[in-house]
Amino acid sequence: IILGESQTFQKNQPFPYGFIKNPINEKFYEELYKTYPSVDDKWYSADDYTRSSIKRHFGRCKANNIIDEDDTSLSEYWNLLFHYLNSKEATEKMSEYTGLKVTKLRSFNFVLNRKGDFNLPHSHHVGIKPEDYEYKFTVLIYFAKDWPKGAPGGTYISEGEDESTIIFEPTDLDNSWICFSETPNSWHGSRYMTHDVPRPSIQFTMV
């Protein structure tokens, strides 16, 4: 499914991005969904004036410091997914999908958005040369089975630093992903959540 969408990703404008439904095998997805980690003291606030959410690292990992070992507080399915994303096969397939050569996982986080959370339009590499990018693309995978039809809160793609320039916003957040390349113009965000259904997701980057 994923590699079949590579041309769409690479040709999309104003920068490469792609939305994919059912990127994860259905049975495996069900196990990930059922064992998505509950909120405890391992989660931390990612709030500032531009955004609001809570996040959780995998095991002893931090941004730009991936440690490929089990997290015994998580299910075997989450450990399998994490180890797969650290594999040569995963980086090769993501390189083929995006057209961007990557060799390793750079970050992996659980991200939970709830009512009142948001992320203002932003881009990660404004004024930075491509050879100095911290990572080459970002992927968010959603686990929100009961997401209200058409509700705000999925990570959108925009043409600029204003929500009036949104060109794509996912509204099916049950086993779906959005991936976008990192450029100085890779504007994205998520609209203010007005409903009570949470948005469980993971976010990972590669370099």
Go through the PLM ranges and name each one.
Residues 4-8, 189-191:
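Catalytic micro-motifs at enzyme active sites that drive phosphoryl/nucleotidyl and oxygen chemistry
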